[in-house]
A protein has these predicted regions:
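A glycine-rich, hydrophobic/aromatic-adjacent loop/helix-cap motif
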Residues: 1-162
Length: 162
């Protein structure tokens, strides 16, 4: 049995158990390049149907001994499928950073260096639907959410690539 600590879009309403991850800090720090089409992934369109030449940001966690991150722990049956979804991240064992023994390893996804470089290179924006989904998930679990993005928040439509 394996578990994943969700600190962003994995913290969906009605899924998982709220817990705090000690020694980590949530940041806006990972991005995908919207100019590149990757089979099996996604890109975004603006309201006019155009494909903005931007990087689209997502949440990340970074080590910070003085911090802690609220999120949810989810039981996961297929880690390989989740690894494919979280292609901008590396899966790391954070079991020791939780004050609960769940009977199996607890993983979190931390940003890959290339995804962090895309975020820094920009121009970088946040998709409004992603931000609202994360806020709703945290509210449903009675958790506070932060930090708010210090980036433009745009109405973008997600297109999944086959």
């Amino acid at each position: 049995m394996a578990f994943v600590f969700g600190y962003g879009s994995l913290a969906e309403p009605g899924a998982g158990r709220p817990l705090r991850l000690a020694g980590w800090r949530r940041v806006w720090g990972v991005a995908m390049d919207n100019r590149v089409t990757i089979p099996g992934y996604k890109y975004f369109l603006d309201g006019a149907g155009g494909r903005p030449a931007v990087c689209v940001a997502f949440l990340d966690v970074v080590p910070d001994p003085a911090a802690g991150v609220d999120g949810v722990v989810l039981e996961v049956g297929d880690l390989d499928a989740l690894d494919a979804r979280e292609r901008n991240y590396a899966r790391v064992d954070v079991s020791a950073a939780l004050d609960h023994d769940l009977g199996g390893p607890v993983w979190a996804y931390t940003g890959l260096e290339e995804a962090r470089k895309r975020f820094a290179a920009g121009p970088t924006v946040v998709q409004r639907a992603y931000l609202e989904s994360v806020r709703a998930g945290f509210a449903a679990h009675g958790l506070g959410f932060g930090p708010e993005p210090a980036l433009p928040v745009l109405d973008l439509e997600r297109v999944d690539v086959v």
